[in-house]
Amino acid sequence: GNWGGLISNAGTRLANALAALVGPKGEILLPELRPEAIPPSVRDVLADLVMRGGDNGPMVEEDWGQPGLTPAERVFAWNTFEVLAIKAGNPDQVANAIPPKAVAWCQIRFTVDRDPDGFLPAIRAHLDARGFHDVAVGQKHDGFMMRASRLLPDHPWVQWARRSLAETTGAEPTILPNLGGSLPNDVFAETLGLPTIWVPHSYAACSQHAPNEHALAPLLREGLQIMTGLFWDLGDGDLPEWKTV
């Protein structure tokens, strides 16, 4: 109580350091953490995609994230910097004292357009240039990460799968260039050099990773039909070459 105005507040310093990295609407302020551009084929397949939270999901906020992008482009074609948790002092038993320490756990969701090995050096340089030498930057889990992967929508294997699904369902499928979450897909796409296609069978309000995670019977039935047709065409049809480029 007697030190206000005399010593720095770790919570205030950390809050301002975070504000130097991400804006009030969630937009990333460092060019090094953002994709340089969205490939034309990616932008084309996302142009008509409408993002919804489902009956029980959260409402999609149209004005959140990078300005000038659609919600679909923000989640599937752009990077995000998320603050997952933040702590200063002892929130469970607050004292009238300036907190000496503060910590924030953050996450960068990134596409293939940026090398993630450059993220921490870019953040360090950005903070140092703005006088935040007292804010440490590090990575959890001993540097482990799932690297981004993407098979461009105009790839021959994507178009082959599109035709198969359309013939089975009688409807044109929605094509995504990649998912917005973490997947170990780079093991197949990069290490093994295989074209990878994911065919998810779920819906937006499935409560993924929650205690009541679930799937709907009609979607599972449709998924069984789709995959039966896909594997039938795989063994019976005219296939593209087995290569990723």
Model-derived features with residue positions:
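A short core secondary-structure module
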Residues: 4-26
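Phosphate/pyrophosphate-binding loop motifs in nucleotide- or prenyl diphosphate-using proteins
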Residues: 126
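Residue-level recognition of well-ordered beta-strand positions that form the cores
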Residues: 105-109
